[in-house]
Amino acid sequence: MATSKCYYPRPSHRFFTTDQHVTATSDFELDEWDLFNTGSDSSSSFSFSDLTITSGRTGTNRQIHGGSDSGKAASSLPVNVPDWSKILGDESRRQRKISNEEEVDGDEILCGEGTRRVPPHELLANRRMASFSVHEGAGRTLKGRDLSRVRNTIFKIRGIED
């Protein structure tokens, strides 16, 4: 069955014109400038002739650039971010050095000449194989003799004999 290229159905109703006309579109719609410029002075002079509209090849990427930047204010206050390396001083350096010497991060593996970064998916795959090494095959559980062997082995390791 062939489909037409028109995605919008044709309207089955008609609108008849009336004598009432809207004189100004600004009565019902907000202008973009009203939303973006709420924090600045209303007395700042701006004319729409200062705007330049550039379009890309496809015509969908339209950008509007303002002509003057004099009336713009900062939208957020500056924040003081503490520098913890200066606050803690030598203690943070000492702690970092101790932690680097004692253990390797979870995503690094020791090699002959140093450490090697391991991608996270390989690291998870290695951990999963270690945790599911009792199971053989996808979706298979231990039953009967296999389960009793595993249970008896665990009891022997723990020191509890059945």
Swiss-Prot record:
Q: Summarize the record's induction comment.
A: Induced by dark, abscisic acid (ABA) and salicylic acid (SA), and slightly by jasmonic acid (MeJA). Triggered by pathogen attack such as Pseudomonas syringae pv. Tomato DC3000.
Name the Gene Ontology biological process terms: leaf senescence; response to abscisic acid; response to absence of light; response to bacterium; response to jasmonic acid; response to salicylic acid
* Keywords of this entry: Cytoplasm
Compartments annotated for it: namely: Cytoplasm
Any matching Pfam family: Senescence_reg
Question: What InterPro entries is this protein classified in?
Answer: Senescence_reg_S40
Gene Ontology, cellular component aspect: cytoplasm
Similarity-based family: Belongs to the senescence regulator S40 family.
Name used for this protein in its record: Protein S40-4
